[in-house]
Design a protein with these regions (language model features):
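Alpha-helical residues within the helix-turn-helix
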Residues: 22, 33, 40
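The N-cap/first-turn positions of alpha helices
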Residues: 1-7, 28, 60
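Hydrophobic two-helix hairpin corresponding to the core of helix-turn-helix DNA-binding domains
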Residues: 8, 20-21, 57-60
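Short helix-boundary/capping micro-motifs
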Residues: 10-25
């Protein structure tokens, strides 16, 4: 099972909650809930949600490399 860090990375890579959900085999709402939980955990809005997809906010751009590192470390431990 992929962590919320991995889910967030997939959303950023795909530029869309829907495409990330399809890739992961999750519902769009499950992906969205995981990203919201990560935003609550960090205390900042990480993504700008628009009709044409998502984009990292300024805070998201600052946090993204750290979130990627955490996800990569998790993968290495598996």
């Amino acid at each position: 099972m992929i962590s919320r860090y991995g889910i967030f990375c997939r959303v950023v890579e795909q530029g869309s909650f829907t495409r990330a959900a399809e890739e992961l085999g999750y519902s769009q709402s499950a992906v969205s809930q995981n990203v919201r939980a990560l935003e609550q955990e960090t205390g900042v809005t990480l993504l700008s949600r628009r009709k044409d997809g998502v984009q990292l906010t300024q805070d998201g751009q600052e946090f993204y490399p750290y979130i990627q590192s955490i996800f990569q470390a998790e993968q290495a431990l598996e």
